[in-house]
Amino acid sequence: MTTDPRNLSRGTAAALDGWIDGAVHIYPLRVQYEDTDAGGIIYHSNYVSFAERGRSACLRCLGIRQEDALAALQQGDREAVMLVVRRVEADFLMTAGLGAELRVETALLKLGGASMKLQQIIRHVEEGMKIENGHILARLLVDIGCVAPHVDGGKRPRRMPSDLAERLRQALTD
């Protein structure tokens, strides 16, 4: 499934969420002043933030709105589930500076009953460069768990709803 952002009007929210190309979600962004450190390069923790934005945009591209799940939980819906980060492993390979065009690529590595493992690659793409040849700045492995409310007031792992699992499987697997 491919949605090319050039086919979307500039004002649509969909254009802000990137697109799915093959089995990879693509989320473009530009490095802003707030993303850099005193040396003018991307501050290391911002790569994790960029990856989070990419994951959220990926879910929205699949019609999964985290804000709807949060609202359902706040209203006491015991069937509502949230996807939460359990673990992040990050390798910082290169850096980029202010104004750099980046792209966050999100791919599904494994889908379990109540969890999934994603690989996220953050690339620096320079003008005229083939995107697949972009310099890899960071590579993250992210473990996500599916949780639901528990009677004790906390949250516990819960099997991912079948419609959610199927959307992920259809869009992010070859």
Describe each PLM feature range:
Residues T2-C61:
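Catalytic strand-loop segment that frames the active site of acyl-thioester-processing enzymes
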Residues Y43-S45, S49, E101-V104, L118:
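Generic detector of contiguous secondary-structure segments
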Residues Q32, Q66, Q74-Q75, Q119-Q120, ...:
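Residue-identity detector for glutamine
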Residues N7-L8, A14-L16, D21, I26, ...:
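Hydrophobic, well-ordered secondary-structure segments
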Residues P28-Q32, D91, D143:
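Generic structural detector for well-ordered beta-strands
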Residues T2-W19, F92-E101, L108-D174:
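HotDog/MaoC-like acyl-thioester-processing domains
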Residues T36-G40, S45-T95:
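N-terminal first-folded block
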Residues V31, D37, E79, K155, ...:
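Residue-level signal for pocket-adjacent positions within structured domains
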